[in-house]
From Swiss-Prot:
It comes from Acidithiobacillus ferrooxidans (strain ATCC 23270 / DSM 14882 / CIP 104768 / NCIMB 8455). This is GTPase Obg. Residues 360-374 have a biased composition (Acidic residues). Keywords: Cytoplasm, GTP-binding, Hydrolase, Magnesium, Metal-binding, Nucleotide-binding. InterPro entries: G_OBG, GTP-bd, GTP-bd_Obg/CgtA, GTP1-OBG_CS, GTP1_OBG_dom, GTP1_OBG_dom_sf, OBG_GTPase, P-loop_NTPase. It is found in: Cytoplasm. Belongs to the TRAFAC class OBG-HflX-like GTPase superfamily. OBG GTPase family. The lineage of its organism: Bacteria, Pseudomonadati, Pseudomonadota, Acidithiobacillia, Acidithiobacillales. GTP binds at residues 166-173, 191-195, 213-216, 283-286, 314-316.
Length: 374
């Protein structure tokens, strides 16, 4: 299944039913008066968050949604049946924007959360409503009100406690495989990861946190190089970032310079994300002898003047991973909550959302999305 995280849809609520024009006609009651009932309301449209969904791919095949219209009123003061409400299932973590005004309508963060996005049309009054002392036999009625219509842009942002950052082949996917049950693709070439992966890291029987792995960044990503910053938005809800770096890159590059380059890309994309707590994780310690690996680790930390926590690990062998996981678990309760994306101003320019969406939907990433990861 392809991973789709932005779509456009059109929604319309149901129109209200028309009121009825009717008069009571029974034996021995020749002038029974008006008894036309009101029309029923139309159906409203709701978005409902569902935890079993993890992509917006279904909306690529159906873009238009309409709720049922209300039924017309009838004689004997009978009100028309209301139209059925329409509930559209979306993944937990979906942001809903008005596509015309770019206004944020809601953020569906919790299982079962409902958001009204198109209110139903009101049912029209029947002629009974217009009866008065001066109008004993009214023949006027009211048509049902029109339902609301709007174009929406749905944007999925994954829910995770911790996010992984790093260059391609830094070992992010290997780390998430080592500490969770997630099984992202791992291979010895750049951009093996083409879409985000989530893994649940279980520390104890009832203690766990969620780790997010996104495709690797490269210098120039904020300007579209590589896979660009398309997936950085999925780290917007995290409380802690782990900056993974290969301590012995095959291209001979300086690990400290690689980290500085990505720090600049992160700041260019979102100052809010760049200011988030970030730990340094130096990976692939198994490639060097023990003392040499420790010396290289200290050299990198010194060159960066790194003051936050730093860890030396080997995701391939598992060395140091347990200590890293335990430190994260201890730190998470004291970390501030992630910035509310509904209040954040710097997560990319919403004015060019249409262009970004068209470019994204034109891509053909034939990658299987791991449904069983979380």
């Amino acid at each position: 299944m392809k991973f789709i995280d932005e779509v456009r849809i059109h929604v319309a609520s149901g129109n209200g039913g028309h009121g009825a024009v009717s008069f009571r006609r029974e034996k021995f009651i020749p002038f029974g008066g008006p008894d036309g009932g009101d029309g029923g309301r139309g159906g409203s449209v709701y978005l409902v968050a569902q935890a079993s969904l993890n992509t917006l791919i279904d909306f690529r095949y159906q873009r238009r949604y309409r709720a049922e219209n209300g039924h017309g009123g009838a004689g004997r003061q009978m009100t028309g049946r209301a139209g059925h409400d329409l509930e559209i299932k979306v993944p937990v973590g979906t942001l809903v924007y008005d596509d015309d005004t770019h206004e944020l309508l809601g953020d569906l963060r919790f299982e079962g959360e409902r958001l009204l996005i198109a209110r139903s049309g009101r049912g029209g009054h029947g002629n009974l409503f217009y009866k008065s002392s001066t109008n004993r036999a009214p023949r006027q009625f009211e048509k049902g009100g029109a339902g609301e219509e709007r174009d929406l842009r749905l944007e999925l942002r994954l829910l995770a406690d911790v996010g992984l950052l790093g260059l391609p082949n830094a070992g992010k996917s290997t780390l998430i495989r080592a500490v969770s049950a997630a099984r992202p693709k791992v291979a010895d070439y750049p951009f093996t990861t083409l879409y985000p992966n989530l893994g649940v890291v279980r520390v104890a029987a009832h203690e766990s946190f969620v780790l997010a792995d996104i495709p690797g960044l490269i210098p120039g990503a904020s300007e579209g190089a590589g896979l660009g910053t398309r997936f950085l938005k999925h780290l917007s809800r995290t409380r802690l970032l782990l900056h993974l770096v290969d301590m012995a890159p095959v291209d001979g590059s300086d690990p400290a310079m690689n980290i500085r380059a990505l720090e600049m890309e992160l700041a260019a994309y979102s100052p809010t994300l760049a200011a988030r707590p970030r730990w340094l994780v130096v990976n692939k310690s198994d490639l060097l002898p023990g003392e040499e690996a420790e010396a290289r680790f200290q050299q990198i930390c010194t060159a960066l003047q790194w003051e936050s926590p730093a860890f030396l690990i080997s995701a391939a062998s598992g060395a140091g991973c347990e200590a890293l996981v335990y430190a994260i678990w201890q730190a998470l309760p004291d970390l501030p909550p992630a910035a509310d994306p509904t209040q954040t101003e710097d997560w990319g320019d919403e004015s060019d959302a249409g262009e970004r969406l068209e470019n994204w939907e034109g891509d053909d990433l034939d990658a299987d999305w791991e449904e069983e990861q979380v």
